[in-house]
């Protein structure tokens, strides 16, 4: 099962993902860490698509339930995940170029509007058992 935690920069994606995977053996792939490993800080359209592909490929290679957290700005690429969590906690992100291209989701499994999300974490963890 592939779980996507997405939203604009600074919305709490990594914090949510870390809490979701705490005390488990579920791999957590963070976009900034993955970009650092590949030394790929290209945020052009091509670079963003390459990163989207890289993140889904990591889940495929892991061959088990995994969690990824990244902006994932395009609806087209969110459909590759079994569970989607939209971190919709603040009005806009830190980077105006990303704010402009970010497509509001057409469908999500969970929308997080504040930082009181323990119930949703428990619900997802129960789905994984």
Residue ranges: model-predicted function:
Residues 14:
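Walker A/P-loop
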Residues 2-4, 27, 65-67:
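Residue-level preference for the first positions of well-ordered beta-strands
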Residues 17-60:
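Conserved substrate/cofactor phosphate-moiety recognition/catalytic segment
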Residues 48-56, 78, 105, 109, ...:
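Amphipathic alpha-helical transducer elements in NTP-driven molecular machines
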Residues 32, 87-88, 113-116:
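Residues at the C-termini of beta-strands that transition into short coil/loop
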Residues 3, 19, 23, 83, ...:
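NTP-dependent small-molecule kinase module
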Residues 59-109:
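ATP-dependent NMP and nucleoside kinases share a basic, alpha-helical "lid"
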Residues 8-9:
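The conserved Walker
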């Amino acid at each position: 099962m592939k779980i996507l935690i997405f939203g604009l920069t600074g919305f709490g994606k990594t914090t949510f993902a870390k809490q979701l995977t705490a005390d488990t053996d579920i791999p957590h792939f963070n976009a900034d860490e993955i970009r650092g490993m590949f030394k790929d800080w290209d945020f052009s359209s091509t670079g963003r698509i390459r990163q989207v592909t890289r993140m889904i490929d990591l889940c495929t290679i892991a061959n088990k339930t995994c969690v990824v957290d990244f902006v994932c700005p395009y609806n087209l690429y969110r459909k590759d995940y079994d569970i989607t969590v939209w971190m919709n906690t603040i009005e806009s992100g830190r980077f105006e170029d990303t704010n402009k291209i970010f497509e509001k989701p057409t469908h999500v499994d969970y929308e997080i509007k504040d930082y009181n999300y323990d119930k949703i974490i428990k619900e997802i963890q129960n789905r994984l058992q």
